[in-house]
From Swiss-Prot:
Main localisation: cytoplasm
Organism this protein belongs to: Xenopus tropicalis
Record's protein name: CXXC-type zinc finger protein 4
Disordered: annotated span: 1-20
PROSITE patterns: ZF_CXXC (PS51058)
Subcellular location: Cytoplasm
Binding-site positions, Zn(2+) 2: C141, C144, C147, C157
Keyword DNA-binding: yes
Keyword annotations from UniProtKB, A to Z: Cytoplasm, DNA-binding, Metal-binding, Wnt signaling pathway, Zinc, Zinc-finger
Domain of life: Eukaryota
Length: 188
């Protein structure tokens, strides 16, 4: 056991600091009738009060995050918050760990994906077309310079490089020929 486990689990004389903070922040509106059998187990195993047990069960607020304030000000374990918010046995068993909480947050929050080279974020990354002959080739040739220098270079095999990627980025835009001044002489 960790030396702070007795503090985290709660001593008979007082509730842990994080649970006191939670009790002061948002549990004042909850009443003891919200507790369920799981809350009773919490009270027996962790020696916590009814207010802490209510964290585990919010039956009237199933599936909504509106019952929980912004997570930044709460110092509760993430698994407790996820189980409170989701309140289903399958989700509760999957959301016990910190990593499960982080995975749940990653799906909800949009993130900025910038290019690995640190280039211009507005620049669109060029991708393989997938239909040309080099794109359809599945294995490297093993004889070209890119294949031979696999440890030092990270270039794609010369025989697998897409035809679209071989073209310069500026040539993909069609240029319309600009008429010369002779075409407009009849205006002057």
């Amino acid at each position: 056991m960790h030396r702070n486990d007795s503090q985290r689990l709660g001593k008979p004389g007082g509730a842990p600091e994080s649970l006191q903070m939670a009790n002061n922040n948002f549990l004042s509106t909850l009443s003891p009738e919200h507790c369920r059998p799981l809350a009773g187990e919490c009270m027996n195993k962790l020696k916590c009060g009814a207010a802490e047990a209510e964290i585990m069960n919010l039956p009237e607020r199933v599936g909504t995050f509106s019952a929980i304030p912004a997570l930044g000000g709460i110092s509760l374990p993430p698994g407790v918050i996820v189980m409170t918010a989701l309140h289903s046995p399958a989700a509760a068993s999957a959301a016990v760990t910190d990593s499960a909480f982080q995975i749940a947050n990653l799906a909800d929050c949009p993130q900025n994906n910038s290019s690995g080279a640190g280039g211009n974020p507005a620049k669109k990354k060029r991708k393989r077309c997938g239909v040309c002959v080099p794109c359809k080739r599945l294995i490297n040739c093993g004889v070209c310079s890119s294949c031979r220098n696999r440890k030092t270079g990270h270039q794609i095999c010369k025989f697998r490089k897409c035809e679209e990627l071989k073209k310069k980025p500026g040539t993909s835009l069609e240029r319309t020929p600009v008429p010369s001044a002779e075409a407009f002489r009849w205006f002057f």
